[in-house]
């Protein structure tokens, strides 16, 4: 027999449904109804809102786990379970620019065992690199940066059992257009970033099939009135998604607002770019091969002081854009769930409350603070 969630409002892609009940059937979402059968079991969240579980499509680590360490038990358990306390129920473990062999080993482990994740569900693998440009290397190792090669990608995808569903590259690398055209034709999402590309170079990559901008504004050629660069292309080119880190450190809130106005909330995917120190205390950590200092809400390279990923919680990024008065609660929820899922073509399994989908959802209070996280209709985290 189904049970029912009672709440003040429910966040759907098309808008907010107020009152009523959401049916749960065998761990799946059912219908939204106004009346329920007599004697039905009710999960009462009167005074609260129900939103889809959040989807983090760019995250390198959490809780002491770094995806690049290839500690598969840590990724499957420590990281995936820890993310439930962040409101995240689906994620893409994200790599860094590294050697062909190390990336092969990481993908092989995740591809073989991703279904064993005991918390947030692994919905794919995101390769952030290695086909980047040294000038905008960020916290990535330029020693491994190079032009894209189909033989490498094929080997990684085979090792991943087809789970590699997103890869980021710099549009100005040699052979990008053919590479992008080929892999997007196979359903892989191509993101553009860590790049010194001109507007025209970026546009050619988008015309070939690229559709996401990596951590907007960061690691990309800026806009001037003579050369629009990557930022100008991100603003101007339609039907593309911009990843956005809303921690108040990576991007000024006003710049976030400009981007949202340029692209529309439906084309913004909130991400964390979180590294191993997420959920932990300030101190010294590693991001891949690089020593990092975490303090005052940021993670920075010891060598240069440059930002090195973040320690942002996705639930806080959602709340920030509302507190900054640049998005409504419904828009913010969609930017942290439905939009990122759509951006990598996994909205057929997650990112929205929809009949037949896994009942992965979160409970929010009136201030958009996380109250609880559910997986398959079962409460897995209580604030």
Question: Which stretches of residues belong to each language-model region?
Answer:
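C-terminal cap of metal-dependent C-N hydrolases
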Residues: 8, 342, 352-383
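Conserved, mostly hydrophobic/aromatic
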Residues: 127, 183, 213, 321, ...
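Active-site mouth loops of central-metabolism enzymes
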Residues: 61-74, 139-146, 189-193
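Divalent-metal coordination cores built from histidine and acidic residues
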Residues: 81-163
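Histidine-rich, glycine-flanked metal-binding segment
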Residues: 1-51
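Active-site core of metal-dependent hydrolases
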Residues: 154, 158-280
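Metal-associated gating/positioning segment near the N- to mid-region
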Residues: 45-105
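His/Asp/Glu-enriched, well-ordered alpha-helical/loop segment
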Residues: 233-242, 260-272, 278-364
């Amino acid at each position: 027999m189904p049970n029912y969630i009672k709440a003040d409002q429910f966040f759907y892609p098309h808008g907010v449904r107020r009152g009523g009940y959401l049916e749960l059937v065998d761990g799946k979402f059912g219908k939204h109804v106004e009346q329920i059968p007599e004697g039905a079991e009710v999960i009462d969240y009167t005074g609260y809102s129900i939103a889809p579980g959040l989807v983090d499509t760019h995250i390198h680590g959490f809780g002491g786990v770094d995806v690049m360490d290839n500690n598969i038990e840590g990724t499957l358990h420590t990281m995936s379970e820890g993310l439930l306390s962040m409101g995240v129920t689906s994620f893409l473990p994200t790599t860094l620019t590294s050697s062909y062999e190390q990336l092969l080993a990481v993908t092989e482990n995740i591809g073989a065992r991703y279904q064993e994740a005991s918390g947030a569900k692994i919905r794919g693998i995101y390769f952030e690199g290695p086909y980047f440009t040294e000038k905008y290397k960020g916290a990535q190792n330029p020693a491994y940066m190079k032009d894209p090669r189909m033989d490498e990608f094929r080997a990684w995808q085979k090792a991943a059992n087809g789970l590699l569903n997103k890869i980021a590259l710099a549009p100005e690398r040699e052979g990008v257009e053919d590479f992008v055209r080929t892999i997007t034709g196979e359903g892989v999402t191509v993101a553009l970033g860590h790049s010194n590309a001109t507007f025209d170079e970026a546009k050619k990559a988008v015309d070939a099939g690229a559709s996401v901008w990596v951590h907007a504004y960061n690691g990309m050629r800026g806009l001037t009135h003579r050369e629009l660069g990557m930022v100008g292309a991100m603003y101007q080119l339609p039907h593309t998604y911009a990843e956005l880190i809303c921690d108040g450190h990576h991007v000024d809130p006003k710049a976030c607002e400009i981007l949202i106005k340029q692209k529309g909330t439906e084309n913004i995917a909130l991400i964390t770019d979180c590294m191993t120190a997420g959920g932990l205390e300030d101190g010294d950590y590693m991001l891949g091969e690089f020593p990092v200092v975490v303090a005052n809400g940021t993670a920075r390279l010891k060598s240069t002081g440059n930002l090195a990923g973040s320690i942002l919680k996705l639930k806080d990024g959602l709340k920030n854009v509302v507190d900054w008065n640049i998005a409504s609660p419904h828009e913010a929820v969609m930017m942290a769930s439905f939009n990122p899922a759509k951006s990598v073509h996994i909205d057929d399994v997650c990112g929205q409350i929809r009949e037949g989908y896994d009942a992965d959802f979160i409970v929010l209070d009136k201030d958009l603070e996380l109250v609880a996280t559910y997986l398959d209709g079962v409460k897995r985290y209580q604030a």
